[in-house]
Swiss-Prot record:
Iron keyword on record: no
Record key words, sorted: Antibiotic, Antimicrobial, Disulfide bond, Glycoprotein, Immunity, Innate immunity, Lipid transport, Membrane, Secreted, Signal, Transport
GO terms of molecular function: coreceptor activity; lipopeptide binding; lipopolysaccharide binding; lipoteichoic acid binding; signaling receptor binding
Protein's name in the database: Lipopolysaccharide-binding protein
Chief subcellular location: secreted
Oligomeric form and interacting partners: When bound to LPS, interacts (via C-terminus) with soluble and membrane-bound CD14.
Function: Plays a role in the innate immune response. Binds to the lipid A moiety of bacterial lipopolysaccharides (LPS), a glycolipid present in the outer membrane of all Gram-negative bacteria. Acts as an affinity enhancer for CD14, facilitating its association with LPS. Promotes the release of cytokines in response to bacterial lipopolysaccharide.
Annotated organism of origin: Mus musculus (Mouse)
Family: Belongs to the BPI/LBP/Plunc superfamily. BPI/LBP family.
GO biological process: acute-phase response; cell surface pattern recognition receptor signaling pathway; cellular response to lipopolysaccharide; cellular response to lipoteichoic acid; defense response to Gram-negative bacterium; defense response to Gram-positive bacterium; detection of molecule of bacterial origin; innate immune response
Transmembrane segments: none
Glycosylated residues in this chain: 300, 355
Entry's localization field: Secreted; Cytoplasmic granule membrane
């Protein structure tokens, strides 16, 4: 992206502004809200961007004929006008309820340097001049919308630029030329500058800011099974105190996307304003992910002998399994075993103040591998456990880790007689804690991507667990390139 007014709005606007409730009965699955502090930061970044753009303004030459009593007739030209310096001092970015944002800049100045030349008969004079443009004020409305792909849009409207005073210094001590400038050039140049400033803002919004907002992802990959839909539910909404934008935050199977039957619940955000932006992620997003994993069979697992550590005191064959069920070796001598774990239903993430937990229910079925390679079921067990989750937010992702309690095992069915449930429970807990959960945590460490546009980082993170949603406050930094 070119250096432009991109940081102005995109610093925050592109930063996933979501709202508390969507339109048409559709609620967002992820929520963020921008505060006055966030808008103030955007305005500050906007000044830096606008100052860079002001230097790119090209000014026309001014020429014509003159007739001055003491001098006579001749031709003049003020040319090679360039902006040498500019200082934008006061800025504010305010909410424009129902439309978007209003940017105002005041008490600013611009310095212009150029050359002049005069021709009268065979006489030619030339020199330079400096122009101090004082009391510059700029105001423009930034209207927010949504395109068909679900990305935010922005357009400039009602731009106004005003100049309070122009102070010119002309080399050569030619007072009549100074008077000529005031009489014939000053008002024209003032109007040109005012128009050029608004043209620059319009161009920057169209060429820099709008394309930058298009870098906001509509979908993002979570892993080889899951994706997340970050398209807008409705156009960004400016309210009296906050700027809200609504994203679906809908998890889907990347290989087979189907409509989500369960509507997204409504979230109620607290009225916080200490940080620039606040995010909320509904437990809906995590529970849809759990459902997709379950439907895809991703939560099921199998345990074979080659998956056990080499130094394990227990092997998955009928001889080593005699302490669990003595009859198995008599009925199936010297045969291998396989354990197949199935999650009965998609685990539900319980989100309550200060707590994240789930209670998956599983069944584990034991199979004997016959000499024909066929599998014959010999026992079936029910397993329940409580798992606590911890989440970590960095500047672009949400990562997680599971902390399981001990699994509780019960016998559902045995085709090989007596079964030592307590001994199997100890074996299963050893495997889960040392093999299965570390693998799951390695996957969770890959992270849940936040819908951030380019060059945006979050810091000063404050994470809270609320009822039915996760809540994150953050400050924002735009990384200039």
């Amino acid at each position: 992206m070119k250096a432009g007014t991109g940081p102005l709005l995109s610093t925050l606007l592109g930063l996933l502004f979501l709202s508390i409730q969507g339109t048409g009965g559709v609620n967002p699955g992820v929520v963020a809200r921008i505060t006055d502090k966030g808008l103030a930061y955007a305005a500050k970044e906007g000044l830096v961007a606008l100052q860079r753009e002001l230097y790119k303004i090209t000014l026309p030459d001014f020429s014509g004929d003159f007739k001055i009593k003491a001098v006579g007739r001749g031709q003049y030209e003020f040319h090679s006008l360039e902006i040498q310096n500019c200082e934008l001092r006061g800025s504010s970015l305010k909410l424009l309820p129902g439309q978007g944002l209003s940017l105002a800049i005041s008490d600013s100045s611009i310095g212009v340097r150029g050359k002049w030349k005069v021709r009268k008969s065979f006489l030619k004079l030339h020199g330079s001049f400096d122009l101090d443009v004082k009391g510059v004020t700029i105001s423009v409305d930034l209207l927010l919308g949504m395109d068909p792909s679900g990305r935010p849009t922005v357009s400039a409207s009602g731009c106004s630029s005003r100049i309070c005073d122009l102070d010119v210094h002309i080399s050569g001590n030619v007072g009549w030329l100074l008077n000529l400038f005031h009489n014939q050039i000053e008002s024209k140049l003032q109007k040109v500058l005012e128009n050029k400033v608004c043209e620059m803002i319009q161009k920057s919004v169209t060429s820099d800011l709008q394309p930058y907002l298009q870098t906001l992802p509509v979908t993002a990959e979570i892993d080889n099974v899951l994706g997340i839909d970050y398209s807008l539910v409705a156009a960004p909404q400016a309210k009296a105190q906050v700027l809200d934008v609504m994203f679906k935050g809908e998890i889907f199977n990347r290989n087979h996307r189907s409509p989500v039957a369960t509507p997204t619940p409504t979230m109620s955000l607290p009225e916080d304003s200490k940080q620039m932006v606040y995010f909320a992620i509904s437990d809906y997003a995590f529970n849809i992910a759990s459902r997709v994993y379950h439907q895809a069979g991703y939560l099921n697992f199998s345990i074979t002998d080659d998956m056990l550590p080499h130094d394990s005191g227990i092997r998955l064959n009928t001889k080593a399994f005699r302490p669990f069920t003595p009859q198995i070796y008599k009925k199936y001598p010297d045969m291998k075993l396989e354990l197949l774990g199935t999650v009965v239903s998609a685990p539900i993430l319980n989100v309550s103040p200060g707590n994240l937990s789930l209670a998956p229910q599983m069944e584990i079925e034991g199979f004997v591998i016959l000499p024909t390679s066929a599998r014959e079921p010999v026992f079936r067990l029910g397993v329940v456990t409580n798992v606590f989750a911890s989440l970590t937010f960095n500047n672009s992702k949400v990562t997680g880790m599971l902390h399981p309690d001990k699994a509780q095992v019960r016998l559902i069915e045995s085709k090989v007689g007596m079964f030592n449930v307590n001994l199997f429970q100890a074996f299963l807990n050893y495997y889960l804690l040392n093999s299965l959960y570390p693998d799951v945590n390695a996957e969770l460490a890959q992270g849940f991507p936040l819908p951030l546009p380019r060059h945006i980082q979050l810091h000063d993170l404050d994470f809270q667990i609320r009822k039915d949603f996760l809540y994150l406050g953050a400050n924002v930094q735009y990384m200039r390139v």
